[in-house]
Swiss-Prot record:
Belongs to the ATPase protein 8 family. The gene is MT-ATP8. Its main location: mitochondrion. F-type ATPases have 2 components, CF(1) - the catalytic core - and CF(0) - the membrane proton channel. One of its GO terms (biological process) is proton transmembrane transport. It comes from Pisaster ochraceus (Ochre sea star). Mitochondrial membrane ATP synthase (F(1)F(0) ATP synthase or Complex V) produces ATP from ADP in the presence of a proton gradient across the membrane which is generated by electron transport complexes of the respiratory chain. F-type ATPases consist of two structural domains, F(1) - containing the extramembraneous catalytic core and F(0) - containing the membrane proton channel, linked together by a central stalk and a peripheral stalk. During catalysis, ATP synthesis in the catalytic domain of F(1) is coupled via a rotary mechanism of the central stalk subunits to proton translocation. This is ATP synthase protein 8.
Length: 55
């Protein structure tokens, strides 16, 4: 059954991307104070987010 093989490959592909996304998100949360990505794009939103975060 080649169709079943394709489905299992697609599932493994999705699982790998999902795992990669989780790892990247965790790394970004660990390195959040040292990254200037959000500061460059949305300074006002970052200030609102920081105020909400520290209250």
């Amino acid at each position: 059954m080649p169709q079943l093989e394709l489905i299992s490959w697609f599932f493994n592909f999705l699982l790998a991307w999902f795992f990669l996304f989780i790892v990247v998100t965790i790394l970004l949360k660990i390195n959040f104070p040292s990254t200037n990505y959000i500061t460059v794009t949305h300074p006002q939103k970052l200030n609102i987010f920081n105020n909400w975060l520290w209250t």
